C-alpha cells in the first residue's frame, strides 16, 4: 500500500467534544414600549443579536410585530381582544411601537355563534385623516324582541342588507374623520360596536356587536415626530414621559362606568 493513502492514520480522535458557546452571550435585551393610548406602557422585552460589523441591532428590531392582549395593555379583565404593535423606531434600549392591527380570540368568536339567531357581518376599507388605510371587519347578531314568544330571531334579507349598510356607514364616519390615535381610542372600549347596536334597534334588535378585526393595509411615510407624539414624548415634558410606565387615562366615547352599590 502506498504511503499517505491510509486514511485511518490521518483521522482525528473520535468523541472530541466541541466547545459549547451560549448564543445569548452575543444578544441584547430591549424593552418594548406601547403607545400612550394604553394604560400599561411597558409590555415586555425582546432579544436581538448585538451590533457587529455591518449588521446593526436596530435594523433587526424594526418591523417586529408583537401581539398583546388588551387585558395586559389596560390592566383589566377584557382579554378577548388582541392588539398587534409593530416596532418602528429604536431609542436606546427602548423599542417604540405603533398600532398594526387588532383581532378577537378564536374562543370568543366561537362562543358568540348560537342557534336561532342571524349572524350579520360587514367589511369596509377606510382611510384615516393621517393617511392610514384600514380594513375593518364588523360582526353582530340578532336577538329576540322584548315580550317575544317565538323562539327564533331571524332577520329578513332586506333587514340584513339595511343593518350591513348601517354598519359600513357608521364605521366609515367614525374612522374617516379621525386620526389613527383617535381610532385606537375608540377600539379600546369598542364604542363603534355600541353605536352600531343603538342605531340598528329600529331595524332589528342586535346584541354582541363588535369590531372583530382591523388590518392596516397602507401606512403613510414614516414620521418620527408623529411616532414620538403617539408615545407622549413630543411635548416639553418628554423627560417625564419616557420613564413613565403608564399611559394617560382619558374619557372615551361610549364608555359607561359600572353601577355602584354604595356611594
Curated annotation (Swiss-Prot):
One of its GO terms (cellular component) is cytosol. It is found in: Cytoplasm. Residues 233-263 are annotated as: Disordered. Keywords: Cytoplasm, Ribonucleoprotein, Ribosomal protein. Residues 235-245 have a biased composition (Low complexity). Its main location: cytoplasm. It holds the Pfam family Ribosomal_S3Ae. Disulfide bonds: none annotated. InterPro entries: Ribosomal_eS1 (IPR001593), Ribosomal_eS1_CS (IPR018281), Ribosomal_eS1_euk (IPR027500). Residues 246-255 have a biased composition (Basic and acidic residues). GO terms for biological process: translation. GO terms for molecular function: structural constituent of ribosome. Belongs to the eukaryotic ribosomal protein eS1 family. Component of the small ribosomal subunit. Mature ribosomes consist of a small (40S) and a large (60S) subunit. The 40S subunit contains about 33 different proteins and 1 molecule of RNA (18S). The 60S subunit contains about 49 different proteins and 3 molecules of RNA (28S, 5.8S and 5S). HAMAP family: Ribosomal_eS1_euk (MF_03122). This is Small ribosomal subunit protein eS1. It comes from Nematostella vectensis (Starlet sea anemone).
Amino acid at each position: 500500500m502506498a504511503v499517505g493513502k491510509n486514511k485511518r492514520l490521518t483521522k482525528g480522535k473520535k468523541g472530541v467534544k466541541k466547545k459549547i458557546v451560549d448564543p445569548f452571550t452575543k444578544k441584547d435585551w430591549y424593552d418594548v414600549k406601547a403607545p400612550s393610548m394604553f394604560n400599561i406602557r411597558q409590555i415586555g422585552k425582546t432579544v436581538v443579536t448585538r451590533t457587529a460589523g455591518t449588521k446593526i441591532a436596530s435594523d433587526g428590531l424594526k418591523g417586529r410585530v408583537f401581539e398583546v392582549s388588551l387585558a395586559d395593555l389596560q390592566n383589566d379583565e377584557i382579554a378577548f381582544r388582541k392588539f398587534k404593535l409593530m416596532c418602528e423606531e429604536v431609542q436606546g434600549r427602548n423599542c417604540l411601537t405603533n398600532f398594526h392591527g387588532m383581532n378577537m380570540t378564536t374562543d370568543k368568536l366561537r362562543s358568540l355563534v348560537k342557534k336561532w339567531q342571524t349572524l350579520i357581518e360587514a367589511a369596509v376599507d377606510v382611510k384615516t385623516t393621517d393617511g392610514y388605510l384600514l380594513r375593518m371587519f364588523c360582526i353582530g347578531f340578532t336577538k329576540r324582541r322584548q315580550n317575544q314568544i317565538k323562539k327564533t330571531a331571524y332577520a329578513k334579507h332586506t333587514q340584513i342588507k339595511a343593518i350591513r349598510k348601517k354598519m359600513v356607514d357608521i364605521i366609515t364616519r367614525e374612522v374617516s374623520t379621525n386620526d389613527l390615535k383617535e381610532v385606537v381610542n375608540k377600539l379600546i372600549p369598542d364604542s363603534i360596536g355600541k353605536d352600531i347596536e343603538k342605531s340598528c334597534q329600529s331595524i332589528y334588535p342586535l346584541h354582541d356587536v363588535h369590531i372583530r378585526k382591523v388590518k392596516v393595509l397602507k401606512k403613510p411615510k414614516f414620521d418620527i415626530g408623529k411616532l414620538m407624539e403617539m408615545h407622549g414624548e413630543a411635548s416639553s415634558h418628554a423627560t417625564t414621559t419616557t420613564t413613565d410606565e403608564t399611559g394617560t387615562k382619558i374619557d372615551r366615547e361610549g364608555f359607561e362606568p359600572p353601577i355602584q352599590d354604595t356611594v
